[in-house]
Swiss-Prot record:
Keyword terms, alphabetized: DNA recombination, DNA-binding, Transcription, Transcription regulation, Translation regulation
Function: This protein is one of the two subunits of integration host factor, a specific DNA-binding protein that functions in genetic recombination as well as in transcriptional and translational control.
Species this chain originates from: Pseudomonas aeruginosa (strain UCBPP-PA14)
Disulfide bond sites: none
Alphabetized InterPro entries for the sequence: Hist_DNA-bd, Histone-like_DNA-bd_CS, IHF-like_DNA-bd_dom_sf, IHF_beta
GO cellular component, one term: chromosome
Domain of life from the UniProt record: Bacteria
Xref: Pfam families: Bac_DNA_binding (PF00216)
Classification via Gene3D superfamilies: IHF-like DNA-binding proteins
Protein name: Integration host factor subunit beta
Amino acid sequence: MTKSELIERIVTHQGQLSAKDVELAIKTMLEQMSQALATGDRIEIRGFGSFSLHYRAPRVGRNPKTGESVRLDGKFVPHFKPGKELRDRVNEPE
């Protein structure tokens, strides 16, 4: 599902909200979440899951075209851990 599809679904289910209001709310939420992660904060949405940063240590990689070894610096990457309610819902038999 894309962001536009999400906006469309919310507008369909919540008739009193305009598409512009929903779009602004989603963009604001995503921006705030991005800023929180960029400053090293953890985000927890109960029943859904949590977002945090995991550190990837420096390592030696390989250029797939040439086979040449390449040094890759350490970096932080976003990580999502689903909550129990989300895991249970995804694994429900249909």
